[in-house]
């Protein structure tokens, strides 16, 4: 429970669904801008390219267990929660968001322009700040909400690659 693996605080289902949809839409907007800039680059979802339905089990395992769960445990579960015990939430959330953005930006820094790298850092950081806010202020400290949003976003990325949608 100290890391946020606990049930979501009682909120109206419609409110929770709105926060989840909002996070997913935020990611989708980001993805629509970034994908064309990184299309020719080998990414984590490149392995699914053109595989269609055959990739679905791999996409689900990758999206739910390999990426979103460990990242949510580390950034929102561990880092944010530990720092929020020692500083105001807004500072702790900003730090974890910057760390999350930097991690994702650094992965692309050697293969995209500096501008694209900063774009990736900024938007993944903004999404991370949103996820931290939703977890701590709307879901009672549970990371399940951000895990759902993050997993859905990664599933979308995998499906786009598998079915060559963009």
Region locations from a protein language model:
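Hydrophobic alpha-helical transmembrane segments
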Residues: 16-21, 57-60, 90-95, 118-122, ...
């Amino acid at each position: 429970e100290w890391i946020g693996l606990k049930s979501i605080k009682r909120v109206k289902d419609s409110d929770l669904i709105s926060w989840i949809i909002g996070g997913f839409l935020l990611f989708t907007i980001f993805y629509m801008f970034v994908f064309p800039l990184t299309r020719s680059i080998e990414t984590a979802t490149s392995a699914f390219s053109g595989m269609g339905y055959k990739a679905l089990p791999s996409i689900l395992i990758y999206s739910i267990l390999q990426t979103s769960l460990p990242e949510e445990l580390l950034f929102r579960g561990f880092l944010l929660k530990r720092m929020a015990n020692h500083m105001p939430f807004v500072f702790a959330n900003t730090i974890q968001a910057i760390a999350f953005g930097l991690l994702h930006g650094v992965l692309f820094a050697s293969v995209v322009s500096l501008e694209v790298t900063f774009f990736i850092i900024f938007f993944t950081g903004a999404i991370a700040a949103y996820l931290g806010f939703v977890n701590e202020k709307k879901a009672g400290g549970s990371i399940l909400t951000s895990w759902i949003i993050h997993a859905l976003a990664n599933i979308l990325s995998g499906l786009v690659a598998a079915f060559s949608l963009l």
